[in-house]
């Protein structure tokens, strides 16, 4: 009886993980773990564009949009956070999870649910 119950719980957990997937939450934002994992691929160093871009000081009071948000491969699901004034901080936290998604898949981070 106990073995049957344990097996049923394991199957139910596996089904829930496949059906709903793991959700990463940061403040009012919720994202699928799959979208967060895509950030790792975007972090790869890109060739510097010498002479094309110049560093300008940000205008006070204007939000600073992280460079990552302008990447054409940036996940659609994450784009709403680019409009937030603290987008860079949120992206840094999500990038930490993207670096080691296994700990999120076992719900080691409080921000991860749906394991």
Curated annotation (Swiss-Prot):
Signal peptide start and end residues: 1-21
SUPFAM superfamilies for the chain: Proguanylin
Cellular-component GO terms for this entry: extracellular region
Subcellular location: Secreted
Keywords for this protein: Disulfide bond, Secreted, Signal
A single GO molecular function term of this UniProt record: guanylate cyclase activator activity
Family note: Belongs to the guanylin family.
Function: Endogenous activator of intestinal guanylate cyclase. It stimulates this enzyme through the same receptor binding region as the heat-stable enterotoxins.
PANTHER family assigned to the protein according to its UniProt record, in alphabetical order: GUANYLIN (PTHR11318:SF3), GUANYLIN FAMILY MEMBER (PTHR11318)
Protein name: Guanylin
Organism annotation: Homo sapiens (Human)
């Amino acid at each position: 009886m106990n073995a049957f119950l344990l097996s049923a719980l394991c199957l139910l957990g596996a089904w829930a993980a496949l059906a709903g997937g793991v959700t990463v939450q940061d403040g009012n934002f919720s994202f699928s773990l799959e979208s967060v994992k895509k950030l790792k691929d975007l972090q790869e160093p890109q060739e510097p564009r010498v002479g094309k871009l110049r560093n300008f000081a940000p205008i006070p009071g204007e939000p600073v949009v992280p460079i990552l948000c302008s990447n054409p491969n940036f996940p659609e699901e994450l784009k709403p956070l680019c409009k937030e004034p603290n987008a860079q901080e949120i992206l840094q936290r999500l990038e930490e999870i993207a670096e080691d998604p296994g700990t999120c898949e076992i719900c080691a981070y409080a921000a991860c649910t749906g394991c």
